Amino acid sequence: MDFSPVGEESLGVRSMCFYVETRDVRILFDAGVSLAPRRFGLPPHPRELERARAVRAEILRLAEAADVVTVSHYHRDHFTPWYPSVYMATDGEMYKRVYRGKKVLMKSPQDLNWSQRRRHYGLSKALQETGAEAVYADGGEWTFGETRVAASPPLWHGPAGSKTGRVVGFAVSDGEERLVFLPDVEGPLEPEPIAFAREARPTVVVVGGPPTYLGWDLEKAIKNLAELVELRPHTLVLAHHLLRDMQWREKVAPLFELAERRGVEVATYASLAGRPEELLEARRRELYAKEPAAAVETGEGEEED
């Protein structure tokens, strides 16, 4: 199994896009990218806009090769929309290049809030136009040659009862590596993502970490991340909300200590790519101070990502 990070906060954008290739199938997880319309009272800096365009170009390149594309849920950084967006770096036509002719494993509209159900409806109509094979993934399993792909039951996007609803995670096994992809579980804060990972016996875990800036129970999140370490994957990739905080390493320091004792490498998308971390959103105030630029106001609203 080969895998490579595509876009994520350590690479300068909001995303968890990740590419996995086995002997049998090529999967593009959550082919989306977006930028926070406002952070610290500021719109995205031009460097963020440039990075979003670069990530979008890489998504389009990898989508050409992919057999399967996932949509774990309908926040804007996890799918390619059918409408133009500066902050999602798309012209309203790029979704065709991402989804045309693909098998699309997508979250069912159950357990979603109104805005996500609305996006699900729009994306479903767009997928019909592309000839994609759209399948509700929740709890499903698929076999491609010797590669098995399993989707989790619906998992909470953050704490149980969260208004943002639920997501689906995925596990890919090719007989050698076993990779678990847990987007936007925000910790995890609940036990279900851990149970799904435990059943998969992962060698690699990619997990959306806790948003320290939202005041969630960080101690609980670290405890649950420790349970993922105890599964003894060779690599634990921390991603997404956690890396919107410049002090994220200090805030989860006990996890690094445990992982070192257990022989588990704690990685980021940037480190997997052999690149330095560039937390552009977390540095937005600094970027405007060091590289003054006219704010690009697009009129794109403040919705949850």
Swiss-Prot record:
Read off the InterPro entries from this record: RibonucZ/Hydroxyglut_hydro (IPR036866), UPF0173_UPF0282_UlaG_hydrolase (IPR050114), UPF0282_hydrls (IPR014426)
Please, which domain of life does this record's source organism belong to? Answer: Archaea
Question: Which Gene3D superfamilies does this entry report, sorted A to Z?
Answer: Ribonuclease Z/Hydroxyacylglutathione hydrolase-like (3.60.15.10)
Q: Which Pfam families does the protein's record reference?
A: Lactamase_B_3
The family database entries (PANTHER family) matched by this protein are listed as:
UPF0173 METAL-DEPENDENT HYDROLASE MJ1163-RELATED (PTHR43546), UPF0282 PROTEIN MJ1629 (PTHR43546:SF4)
Q: Which family does it belong to?
A: Belongs to the UPF0282 family.
**What protein name is recorded for this chain?**
UPF0282 protein Pisl_0021
